[in-house]
Each structure stands twice: as structure tokens, then as C-alpha cells.
């Protein structure tokens, strides 16, 4: 399922119109920026299902005007995702360093 369709489903949107489409695009862009900032880097929302689920949830919170509640309600998931993201980035950096020294 396409990410935009998944977000629409998460928000309970079953109709299509230009206003709603534009609103979902703006919310998705905002949520992507927020999560990338929280993770300390760029998340791959196509392959990282943990980050993808957080993105869908954050979009739902923003859509329902409850963005300020997201961090509190998803603190454990955000911490786990950030740790995983940082570990992956560290491993990539270590691998690149190893290749440069060979």
C-alpha cells in the first residue's frame, strides 16, 4: 500500500477531494520533518516499518489537532526507533571507516 493511502486510512479518510488531498500532503510533509528531527537524521519511511508506523500515527495526531499529545503517548516507541536509527547510522559509519583503511 502506498504511504499516502496508508496515512489516509490511519486518519479514517475514505473520500477524495482536492482540499483533503492538499491537507494530507501538508500534514505528511510536516510529520516527516518532525520525525526526521526526532531521529537525528533522515528516516526511510518506505523500508523502516517502525518509522513508517510512527509517521502514520503522527499524521493521525496532527490531522485530529492533537500533535502535542503524540510525544507523550509514543515516548517508548520514539526512543526505541531513535536508538535503532542511531545504531544503524553508527554501523554504516564504522563500515565506511573500515573500507577506507583497507
Residue ranges of model-derived segments:
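Conserved short "hinge" loops at termini or chain/domain junctions
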Residues: 1-51, 84-102
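Alpha-helical structural motif
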Residues: 3, 27, 55, 70, ...
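Intrinsically disordered, low-complexity peptide-like regions
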Residues: 5, 62-63, 71, 95
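Intrinsically disordered, low-complexity N-terminal regions enriched in serine/proline/glycine
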Residues: 18, 60-62, 73, 89
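Mid-chain, well-packed structural core segment of small domains
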Residues: 42-49, 54-67
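C-terminal structural segments of small proteins and small subunits
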Residues: 63-84
Amino acid at each position: 500500500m502506498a504511504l499516502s493511502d496508508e496515512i489516509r486510512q490511519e486518519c479514517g479518510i475514505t473520500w477524495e477531494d482536492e482540499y483533503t488531498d492538499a491537507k494530507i500532503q501538508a500534514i505528511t510533509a510536516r510529520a516527516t520533518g518532525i520525525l526526521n528531527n526526532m531521529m537525528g537524521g533522515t528516516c526511510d519511511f518506505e523500508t523502516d516499518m517502525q518509522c513508517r508506523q510512527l509517521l502514520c500515527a503522527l499524521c493521525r495526531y496532527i490531522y485530529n489537532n492533537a500533535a502535542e499529545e503524540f510525544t507523550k503517548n509514543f515516548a517508548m516507541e520514539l526512543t526505541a526507533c531513535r536508538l535503532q536509527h542511531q545504531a544503524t547510522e553508527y554501523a554504516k559509519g564504522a563500515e565506511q571507516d573500515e573500507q577506507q583503511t583497507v
